[in-house]
Curated annotation (Swiss-Prot):
It comes from Moorella thermoacetica (strain ATCC 39073 / JCM 9320). Belongs to the fluoride channel Fluc/FEX (TC 1.A.43) family. PANTHER family: FLUORIDE EXPORT PROTEIN 1-RELATED (PTHR28259:SF1). It is a multi-pass membrane protein. GO terms for biological process: cellular detoxification of fluoride. The gene is fluC1. InterPro entries: FluC. Pfam families: CRCB. Na(+) binds at G74, T77. Its main location: membrane. The chain crosses the membrane at residues 4-24, 32-52, 70-90, 99-119. This is Fluoride-specific ion channel FluC 1.
C-alpha cells in the first residue's frame, strides 16, 4: 500500500509542477527561472507545514504522510531542474543572475521551510477550535 501512496502522490506532484510551471512561464517569460524558484519555495513551505502539522497535531498514518511529502512534494519540487537552470545561466555568462538564483533558492527554501513549521504551530483560533469540539447537535 505504501507504494500506491508514493505513486499517486508522485503523479499528482509531477503533473501539478508541469502545469504550474507552464502557467508561470507564460505569465512571466524571462531569463530568471521564476517558475522553478516559486515551485521549489512553495514546496519547502508545504513540506515544513505538512511534516510539522501531521507529526504534532493531526493523526495521520505514516504511509499517507510519506505519499504527501516524499511522493507529492518530492515530485512537485525539483533539484535537478534547479541545477540545470543554474548551469545554463553560468554557461550563458549570466553569473550575477546565477548567483542570485543560487542564493535566493537556498535562503528562500530555508526561510519557507521555517515559515511552514511556524504556521503549522500557530494556535487554532477559539472559533475554529470550538467548531471542532462542538457536536453537530450543538452540545459540547
Amino acid at each position: 500500500m505504501l507504494y500506491l501512496y508514493l505513486a499517486v502522490g508522485g503523479f499528482c506532484g509531477a503533473v501539478g509542477r508541469y502545469f504550474l510551471a507552464s502557467f508561470i512561464n507564460r505569465l512571466w517569460p524571462g531569463s530568471f527561472p521564476l517558475a522553478t524558484w516559486i515551485i521549489n519555495l512553495g514546496g519547502c513551505l508545504a513540506m515544513g507545514f505538512i511534516l510539522t502539522y501531521t507529526l504534532e497535531r493531526l493523526v495521520m498514518g505514516p504511509e499517507l504522510r510519506l505519499g504527501l511529502t516524499t511522493g507529492m512534494l518530492g515530485a512537485f519540487t525539483t533539484f535537478s531542474t534547479f541545477s540545470v537552470e543554474t548551469l545554463h545561466l553560468l554557461q550563458g555568462e549570466k553569473i550575477p543572475l546565477a548567483l542570485l538564483y543560487l542564493f535566493a533558492s537556498l535562503a528562500g527554501g530555508l526561510i519557507c521551510m521555517q515559515t511552514g513549521i511556524f504556521l503549522a504551530r500557530l494556535p487554532l483560533s477559539s472559533k475554529a477550535l470550538s467548531s471542532i469540539i462542538t457536536r453537530e447537535d450543538g452540545e459540547e
